[in-house]
Amino acid sequence: MKKSPGLSDYLWAWTLFLSTLTGRSYGQPSLQDELKDNTTVFTRILDRLLDGYDNRLRPGLGERVTEVKTDIFVTSFGPVSDHDMEYTIDVFFRQSWKDERLKFKGPMTVLRLNNLMASKIWTPDTFFHNGKKSVAHNMTMPNKLLRITEDGTLLYTMRLTVRAECPMHLEDFPMDAHACPLKFGSYAYTRAEVVYEWTREPARSVVVAEDGSRLNQYDLLGQTVDSGIVQSSTGEYVVMTTHFHLKRKIGYFVIQTYLPCIMTVILSQVSFWLNRESVPARTVFGVTTVLTMTTLSISARNSLPKVAYATAMDWFIAVCYAFVFSALIEFATVNYFTKRGYAWDGKSVVPEKPKKVKDPLIKKNNTYAPTATSYTPNLARGDPGLATIAKSATIEPKEVKPETKPPEPKKTFNSVSKIDRLSRIAFPLLFGIFNLVYWATYLNREPQLKAPTPHQ
């Protein structure tokens, strides 16, 4: 006999429907229960890992050498200071090693933790050998990451800003290239206890972000990695080295130094085309260009450290200074010979004065008349001939036309100096040859892409 459904059956159906809507069913835990269970599992795993753990002891103490694998991701490179010979770099510094004491078994394969756990376990005492100042970012919390896998392998990542030394050889400045190193290793553990290795192959162990360059005067050509051993009084230590290869941009220095020097030399050679009697003009050309070169040489050195050797720019400025100073000396030489009595063509510089000719005529009222001699007749003696002589000796002055002035002597000017003629050709030719050799030598040099790392 079939039994009709009762009140209990209706209640069972409604209970099953409501449990379906709320995500619950008989025999299955709720989501909150699952999260609570996972949190409990995490807590128990961490408590078990740290139970009896001594973070003062390195992994494998007394059994094996601890291997620390590293790689670097550069988020920002620069700026570079030539004066202080240093550079600034912002990196994500990653280290990985294995600690058997941190093995675990659980529903998860990786424990993702933050800096709080990192302070409770052993971590490598890595420091930067050539670092002047290193800063670990702490805003808003310490920028540190820790991952622990079930086999005890740890990944420890931190964000650092490092200001490191970059030894520079400025002989080729400003066509120079540099390899700025970043050296790091263990501070306390020798290579018998802790060794460092690159995580990946050399080409991928250090990576620079595409937009990571913060350089105005340099091009970042690339980077290379290396490793070596450094001997000290406390033992031998493994040192990992990364070289960042830089090539200086020359555009700024062409505009600020090279072009002004070239234009100053050309301006100094304009004086060769001026008349050698133009002493003030040629003196102004010479003195002004010499002072200009002096100012340029001083300003070019302001951005560089006080090195004891001459740079490529120093040689260029020195040669330009020599050309400008030689132009001034050339004018002094020409002027010295110009002051003498004869020019280079043998003609007299001082015009000859016309000789004075005595004129027997007397000028009177713009007329010329010969000198008249009067004889007084002696009538007392009664000599009739004397009266005749007196009469004939007196000659009335005749009007004479004014005599034309003698032609002025032809003025003799100094011809163009032979020294000036020679300088007009020699100076530009020599300066052009110098520029050709200078730029061909320095621009065709290949940058040194590999800096040596000492191995011992």
Curated annotation (Swiss-Prot):
It catalyses: chloride(in) = chloride(out). Keywords: Cell membrane, Chloride, Chloride channel, Cytoplasmic vesicle, Disulfide bond, Glycoprotein, Ion channel, Ion transport, Ligand-gated ion channel, Membrane, Postsynaptic cell membrane, Receptor, Signal, Synapse, Transmembrane, Transmembrane helix, Transport. The chain crosses the membrane at residues 254-274, 280-301, 312-333, 422-441. Gene3D superfamilies: Neurotransmitter-gated ion-channel ligand-binding domain, Neurotransmitter-gated ion-channel transmembrane domain. It is found in: Postsynaptic cell membrane; Cell membrane; Cytoplasmic vesicle membrane. Allosterically activated by benzodiazepines, the neuroanesthetic alphaxalone and pentobarbital. Inhibited by the antagonist bicuculline. Potentiated by histamine. The keyword Transmembrane applies. One of its GO terms (cellular component) is postsynapse. The keyword Signal applies. 4-aminobutanoate binds at R94, T157. Cerebellar granule cells, Purkinje cells and stellate/basket cells. Residues 1-27 form the signal peptide. It holds the Pfam family Neur_chan_LBD. It is a multi-pass membrane protein. Residues 28-253, 302-311, 442-456 are extracellular. One of its GO terms (biological process) is chloride transmembrane transport. GO terms for molecular function: GABA-A receptor activity; GABA-gated chloride ion channel activity. The extracellular domain contributes to synaptic contact formation. The GABA-binding pockets are located at the interface between neighboring alpha and beta subunits. Heteropentamer, formed by a combination of alpha (GABRA1-6), beta (GABRB1-3), gamma (GABRG1-3), delta (GABRD), epsilon (GABRE), rho (GABRR1-3), pi (GABRP) and theta (GABRQ) subunits, each subunit exhibiting distinct physiological and pharmacological properties. Interacts with UBQLN1. Interacts with TRAK1. Interacts with KIF21B. Identified in a complex of 720 kDa composed of LHFPL4, NLGN2, GABRA1, GABRB2, GABRG2 and GABRB3. Interacts with LHFPL4. Interacts with NLGN2. Alpha subunit of the heteropentameric ligand-gated chloride channel gated by gamma-aminobutyric acid (GABA), a major inhibitory neurotransmitter in the brain. GABA-gated chloride channels, also named GABA(A) receptors (GABAAR), consist of five subunits arranged around a central pore and contain GABA active binding site(s) located at the alpha and beta subunit interface(s). When activated by GABA, GABAARs selectively allow the flow of chloride anions across the cell membrane down their electrochemical gradient. Alpha-1/GABRA1-containing GABAARs are largely synaptic. This is Gamma-aminobutyric acid receptor subunit alpha-1. It comes from Bos taurus. The lineage of its organism: Eukaryota, Metazoa, Chordata, Craniata, Vertebrata. The gene is GABRA1.
